[in-house]
Amino acid sequence: MKYDLIIIGSGSVGAAAGYYATRAGLNVLMTDAHMPPHQHGSHHGDTRLIRHAYGEGEKYVPLVLRAQMLWDELSRHNEDDPIFVRSGVINLGPADSAFLANVAHSAEQWQLNVEKLDAQGIMARWPEIRVPDNYIGLFETDSGFLRSELAIKTWIQLAKEAGCAQLFNCPVTAIRHDDDGVTIETADGEYQAKKAIVCAGTWVKDLLPELPVQPVRKVFAWYQADGRYSVKNKFPAFTGELPNGDQYYGFPAENDALKIGKHNGGQVIHSADERVPFAEVVSDGSEAFPFLRNVLPGIGCCLYGAACTYDNSPDEDFIIDTLPGHDNTLLITGLSGHGFKFASVLGEIAADFAQDKKSDFDLTPFRLSRFQ
């Protein structure tokens, strides 16, 4: 059997692509080395932020606004346990922060609902937060967080119900191209399709070693908290920049545990074996202490944590492009630790590619040619 589309990697983007392409009427095969959702990539840990006024650059705003529409649509499939929680996101940092300047610029350009607060205003609204006098906060009322594993599970189930073929716990070991399409090699045999999407995450270089993607081991952890830090108490999700430039992110507490991680830093790795579990690197348990001690002093001890991986591009912007020399294969990689919020729209972009539809978005900034 020859498929219209084979998806290599069915985590964040791949699960979305499988659903949207199958819903469009294509004959699709989703593949993954494990059984998604799983603990081997970048999507586990239950929650991910979604921010609209984007500090990483204005080029992302049209994408994230479409992503939000798709997240709202997906959430309607799980109304008892919503995939998107509109908690709001407070972005904290020094008044001269370049990241916050980008957030403010994005908000102005796209007329987004963002409120600027000075240090006293931040601490008056959320007494649990402490910041220096030179800090500001940019509060995104309409943003919040996503339940990442639930989203992937939902997409995979919806795709299956729509007739999508799924080959999980079966790594793809090679990709071949010919005039007739794409062939993948797996332990279960060979499969053919007219087109392929490669969204294999951290270990995409096992298949395509020439790609400029660097795996980095990262950790996040849950710390003892109480009801003051919960969504019910209107405590928001957050990003925070310390005076030394270190960047953190976190979520409202659930079940008396507040999740936080450090965005920058981490350990460069070259194999899955090097992504050791949480606490096997000495700094894991204390990585968030500088932020917690200064900004959230009421948070208690570390309860537990987890390790994940970022697939970093050289400039930490996404790679969305066809494989050089093979216009029938789309790469979506290098998401660099800020990609999950875009998974829905990237999956839709992948489905459009499979249907020979022109994308509604300017993807020029994400081309591989920028590294030449």
UniProtKB/Swiss-Prot annotation:
Cofactor(s) needed for function? FAD
Catalytic activity entry? N(alpha)-methyl-L-tryptophan + O2 + H2O = L-tryptophan + formaldehyde + H2O2
**S-8alpha-FAD cysteine: residues bearing it:** 308
| InterPro entries assigned | FAD-dep_OxRdtase, FAD/NAD-bd_sf, Me_Trp_Oxase_MTOX, MTOX
GO cellular component term of the entry, any: cytosol
List the SUPFAM superfamilies: FAD-linked reductases, C-terminal domain, FAD/NAD(P)-binding domain
What are the binding positions for FAD in this chain?
4-34
Which Gene Ontology terms cover its molecular function? Answer: flavin adenine dinucleotide binding; N-methyl-L-amino-acid oxidase activity; sarcosine oxidase activity
- NCBIfam families registered for this protein in UniProt: PRK11259.1
Regarding protein family, the annotation reads: Belongs to the MSOX/MTOX family. MTOX subfamily.
Alphabetized PANTHER family for the sequence:
FAD DEPENDENT OXIDOREDUCTASE DOMAIN-CONTAINING PROTEIN (PTHR10961:SF7), PEROXISOMAL SARCOSINE OXIDASE (PTHR10961)
Q: What does this protein do?
A: Catalyzes the oxidative demethylation of N-methyl-L-tryptophan.
Protein name from the UniProt record:
N-methyl-L-tryptophan oxidase
Q: Which organism is it from?
A: Escherichia coli O1:K1 / APEC
